[in-house]
């Protein structure tokens, strides 16, 4: 499980960097876990350099028996009985006249719980699009009503892979609504906006990375299996969002080191955190292309013959939509698709005032998997 969670986190950080290049000061929010799961289903049917490029980009080449690892991980992450709701849903929508190999369909069903829904892309692509959107809307409790916009599928579409993830968790320590006030949030050294700032003082795992001048706070959700971890620069020191130094230095090893429970101290923290809601939509072709996935999107080069027995399939688009809402009660989120740090001695009480841009992620603690990763520059 550890190999897979490292692979997923490594991919998460690399994708974050390409999204950051496209939008250096905008909000970012996505589910690396959802994207990795969806592309792992593609690898099941990929051959040759198509498969090799995918394995390398997603770092699956360092994981033994990738598909059964995903099977265990999906079961572990979405097991029933937890005090939060975390739902993973996979489905393949295939052109009904097209012959997919029974072995491929059996494998995606067994490893990813993804069944094939036959639809009529050829004669009724708009109906097929609506059907796919309806299903995703149901799986994400209405938070992602339109995964595929008009024109994304047409009569030439053979296959749409859909992966949706939905999370709703209550804070272990809730914020009281009466403590929420209007407060300024600094977007940069020059600009501010007014936000609804929540407040509480409780004991939380807290750390300070001195060489980065960055505070780390972990806020667990009820049940303790999931946490939100926030990386907050002490101040805005660059001419942009204040996050440039962290974004430059962040690696898999450093992130694990900075945010490990044993490196944080459980102390009283005055937490001020804005309410926020972010919805993002990405077509990931060019981002994945920059990370090394080339052949998959090319009708002449893609080899998905493990899905159909022939070489006429390729993936035209990978669309990922995500949603997160953080308030006094907790968090609702959905998505469809080193150096050792030196920690400082802390005071008995710390201030954690999130009044400028920050990076956050939602982690499944038992497996250390990053389910969602984001940056808030403007809540």
Curated annotation (Swiss-Prot):
GO terms for biological process: cellular homeostasis; inflammatory response; negative regulation of interleukin-1 beta production; regulation of innate immune response; regulation of protein catabolic process; type B pancreatic cell proliferation. SMART domains: SERPIN (SM00093). Ubiquitous with higher expression in pancreas, spleen and bone marrow. Its main location: secreted. GO terms for cellular component: collagen-containing extracellular matrix; cytolytic granule; early endosome; extracellular region; extracellular space. Residues 351-379 are annotated as: CARD-binding motif (CBM). CDD domains: serpinB1_LEI (cd19560). The modification Phosphoserine is found at residue 300. InterPro entries: Serpin_CS, Serpin_dom, Serpin_fam, Serpin_sf, Serpin_sf_1, Serpin_sf_2. The record marks 344-345 as: Reactive bond. It is found in: Secreted; Cytoplasm; Cytolytic granule; Early endosome. Neutrophil serine protease inhibitor that plays an essential role in the regulation of the innate immune response, inflammation and cellular homeostasis. Acts primarily to protect the cell from proteases released in the cytoplasm during stress or infection. These proteases are important in killing microbes but when released from granules, these potent enzymes also destroy host proteins and contribute to mortality. Regulates the activity of the neutrophil proteases elastase, cathepsin G, proteinase-3, chymase, chymotrypsin, and kallikrein-3. Belongs to the serpin family. Ov-serpin subfamily. Monomer. Interacts (via C-terminus) with CASP1 and CASP4 (via CARD domain); these interactions regulate the activity of inflammatory caspases. This is Leukocyte elastase inhibitor A. It comes from Mus musculus. The gene is Serpinb1a.
